[in-house]
UniProtKB/Swiss-Prot annotation:
A cellular component term, taken from the record's GO annotations: cytosol
Complex formation: Homodimer.
Class of the enzyme per the UniProt entry, highest EC level: isomerase
Entry-linked InterPro entries: NagB/RpiA_transferase-like, Ribose5P_isomerase_typA_subgr, Ribose5P_isomerase_type_A
Membrane among keywords: no
A molecular function GO annotation: ribose-5-phosphate isomerase activity
Pfam families: Rib_5-P_isom_A (PF06026)
Protein name: Ribose-5-phosphate isomerase A
Lineage start: Bacteria, Pseudomonadati, Pseudomonadota, Betaproteobacteria, Nitrosomonadales
Primary gene name: rpiA
GO biological process: D-ribose metabolic process; pentose-phosphate shunt, non-oxidative branch
Length: 219
């Protein structure tokens, strides 16, 4: 299968994790978009969705799926989203699309995190993909200096503003051997909203597209 075919296959496979009569959380990105397109075929089975970005909310609305504010719902049964990188320990780098903070919030509320990805996203060690860090604008230079002390090379994603009105620093040249530790350390820097490491709240299930079909991986 091509990469696009793998993405479509995992998007379809994720439908089996959608509970009837519930509200679900949905991520942001190309694979999440394909999942939304598949979800539209069974939209009558769910009560609605909580979106992790304005882009996702708009796509859901285009399909006639009700979008709910997270503050109006309680715990979500499932959150379905892609990843920029993922290990077999279910640790991820996310946020290539800049929606990492809202993705992390919605994932935290969900009982189960289903990651959908093609096989190119599976890695042994995180860090080849630049790690996004969402930062309060006035703290950009300070945070960049602090990240440099941690061994990273931050690059300002110029011209991009998050849905929360903040900026993104993409951190290059990290060899992330301890994702939980680094996630915590980065989040302790004053001015950092959050970073794209999803290690403290890792995925529960990975649906990975391969040449042979969809492989289900759990820890």
């Amino acid at each position: 299968m091509t990469q696009d075919e793998q993405k479509r296959a995992v998007a379809q496979a994720a439908l089996q994790y959608v509970p009837t009569g519930e509200i679900i959380g949905i991520g942001t990105g190309s694979t999440a978009n394909l999942f939304i397109d598949e979800l539209a075929k069974i939209k009558h089975r769910i009560e609605g969705a909580v979106a992790s970005s304005e882009v996702t909310a708009n796509r859901l609305k285009q399909h006639g799926i009700e979008v709910l504010d997270l503050n109006s719902v309680g715990e979500l049964p499932v959150y379905i989203d892609g990843a920029d990188e993922i290990t077999r320990n279910m640790h991820m780098i996310k946020g290539g699309g800049g929606a990492l903070t809202r993705e992390k919030i919605v994932a935290a509320v969900a009982r189960k995190f289903i990651c959908i990805a093609d096989q190119s996203k599976l890695v042994k060690v995180l860090g080849k993909f630049p790690l996004p860090v969402e930062v309060i604008p006035m703290a950009r230079s300070y945070v960049a200096r602090e990240i440099t002390l941690l061994g990273g090379q931050p690059a300002w994603r110029q011209g991009f503003t998050t849905d929360n009105g903040n900026i993104i620093l993409d951190v290059h040249n990290l060899n992330i051997m301890n994702p939980v530790e680094l996630e915590t350390a980065l989040n302790q820097i004053a001015g950092v909203v959050t970073n794209g490491l999803f290690a403290r709240r890792a995925a529960n299930v990975l649906l990975m597209g391969t040449d042979q079909g969809v492989e289900t991986i759990t820890v």
